[in-house]
Amino acid sequence: MKRPTTYAFLAASLLGSSQGAILTFSDDFSGPLDEAWRQQSFEGGHLGISDGKYGLTANQGGGSNPKLSRSTAGELDSSYVNSVSVVFNEFGFGGDNTQSDFKWKNFGSEGFMEVVLNSFGDMRLFHNDFDGGGGNIQPNTRIAVANGDLLTLSNAYNATSDTIDFTYSVNGGDPISFYSGGGIDGPIGDTNTNFVEVEVFKWGASEFKPNIGIDDWSLKTSGDAVPEPSSIALVSLAGLFLLHRRK
């Protein structure tokens, strides 16, 4: 008969192994906000979930830029795809210009990356290497997007080549290549095992305020087989409980 300490050791081993990999997730914002999300900075900029989208707005001035972030804590042990779909209800793009930036960021142990789309329709990709390098790896490039459009951004990291393929699509259309290659100093490195974040930043004094809705956001590793530790813990403990009942 196995002793209780043996069960505890097995549970700890299973849980510990799960915490080594990057935390994956997929959220379509169809229900209450998952507790894993962190609502940060400008409280009034967080509009909450409505019609399957998480809304954000912003005011001009210090601290008036809301951020929605989520931990991805773990180790970069495989390729991954980080993707987000956003509806730009009111932003600019030739309409009433809100003089704002939409920022999509990911942070890791070796650096961070961010996509910045301004209200004129120019998008750029920035990479910072914690060893010292930092700058745009894709400069401001005008993309065809308008108020009311659904914009999907996808960052696919290849662990073997240490490169990324970054694409975007509008209203469910075919993906369009935006950038393919390495980082500011060559390799991309780990830019995704700390947290991911969306920020809306209003930099101008325009009377018009930005209004966006995050429709879908996911982070998947190759094979998409790494559940979060809480899920593994539940499965592990349930299995150990059944083993104990059989004794």
Model-identified regions with their sequence ranges:
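C-terminal cell-surface anchoring/sorting signal
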Residues: M1-Q19, S230-K247
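Boundary/junction segments of secreted and surface-exposed precursor proteins
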Residues: G20-D28
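Extracellular beta-strand elements of beta-rich domains used
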Residues: F29, D215-L219
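Carbohydrate-binding surfaces in secreted/extracellular proteins
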Residues: F29, V84-V86, N147-G182
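Extracellular glycan-recognition surfaces and repeat-rich motifs
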Residues: P32-S64
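Secretory/extracellular carbohydrate-interaction modules
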Residues: A58-L125
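Short, aromatic/His-centered strand-loop micro-motif at the edge of beta-sheets
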Residues: N128-T152
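Flexible glycan-contacting loops in extracellular carbohydrate-active proteins
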Residues: F178-I212
